[in-house]
Amino acid sequence: MNFKRFLYADLLKWKANTKHKPLILRGARQVGKTTLIRQFAKEFDHFIELNLELKSDITPFQELDDIEQILNAIYLLKGSPKPKQQTLIFIDEIQESAKAIKQLRYFYEKLPNLHVIAAGSLLEFALQKVGSFPVGRIEYLYLHPLNFEEFLLAKENNNAVEALNTVPFPKFAYSTLFNLFHEYAIIGGMPEIVANYIEHNNIARLASNYNALWETYKDDFAKYASNNTEKQLLRFIIEQAPNEADRISFEKFGNSVYRSREVGEALRLLDLAGIQLLIYPTTNTALPIQVNVKKRPRLQFLDVGLLNEALSLQGEMLTITNLNDFYRGKIISQLINQELIAIHNSYKYKPVFWVRDKKTSSAEVDLVYKHKQMLIPIEIKSGAAGKLKSLHQFMNVCEHPYAIRLLANKLEVIDAKTISGTKFKLLNLPYFLAAKLPEYIKWFIGNY
């Protein structure tokens, strides 16, 4: 099944740029990188695909140094003519050859007319070993699981997509979009699983797909363990992480006897691979956003569908009407972060939450989001506006009057006031509009 991915537009811009550079497409395993590039290849007259897990395909990079000789060897290997233009060369599984990664820069320096894209599984580890490229020689894009809008496009629900992109949101579409978003919240955005679900419309059929994905990730990380002890630790971390509470501590993680340093190293490996991100807080209420890595982080999973499967929640979720109140709000927080991550394709975006920088009292705001010169606080919870105590503490010290709450409710803007009397504007936004936060922040500030 071919999906409509928003990253495709970025690929078209890259193709049209007369000064394009070799492109590395980054992202976790099984998010659809190879499928997307094969779709994109139809924009070219000539397409050559290499898989460096194959000995025949990796040999030119391993045995030759001159980039023009490498290219001639590829043409010979693939039985391809030597086209002058409109050629896309796709180097898949490039993590298998550090030398091939280093050679990418020479396509730009010596063969700038060629379009070259590289991708791979656990590519982040290989890139880390290779080190940085000279500035301006390589471009990067990031592909994520399907977001809610891409899920709707896959279901060919164009009316829902139109409503989702209407600002402000039309009142008649609320019920329908909530139901569709709850469906997406159960399934998640992994392409193989979404394709299976759309074809059969049967959640029960998906368990084997989820389990296979989890096992693939576990097996992948075993490759990066230097001994059996590290292998066991990585497997423990990836299996235990879904069960952890909102914020984690490396010390005694999962009630284990592993040392804080060992757990931290393992979690940073998972973060590097994009499977489980470490999300750190800021204590700032104004720009710049400076995260504090000494404070306890949250864990953000690659995909909410995988998390639901790991926690065996999908059956319960079939009857849920308000995700704010389900599983202590963990699933909706994960999902909103996933939506925000997915709209950032040009760099590795991580959500940030806020904590008060005082030991005498604790306060947390679920998200802060940069808009121009403002840091907008965002809560992901229901309840009366007057009971949002952490948000009140943020608004008491920030330099603007705008706050947002994502919940299972209709869109409205209310005049609010903190306990100490600070007045502010609160935008109540349906949580299915999380990916549209940039548009709604602009609309909110522009109209209120």
Task: Name these PLM-found stretches.
Residues M1-A16:
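N-terminal pre-Walker A segment at the start of P-loop NTPase domains
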Residues L411-Y448:
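Domain-level recognition of nuclease-like catalytic cores that cleave nucleotide substrates
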Residues L36, F40:
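Hydrophobic positions on the alpha1 helix immediately C-terminal to the Walker A/P-loop
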Residues Q128-R247:
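Interdomain motor-coupling "hinge/lid" segment immediately C-terminal to the ATP-binding subdomain
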Residues K33:
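Conserved lysine of the Walker
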Residues A195-E364, Y369:
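Accessory nucleic acid-recognition modules appended to NTPase machines
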Residues L54-Q85:
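Short glycine-rich substrate-engagement loop in P-loop NTPases that contacts/grips substrate
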Residues L340, V365-A384, A403:
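Conserved catalytic cores of phosphodiester-cleaving nucleases, focusing on short active-site segments
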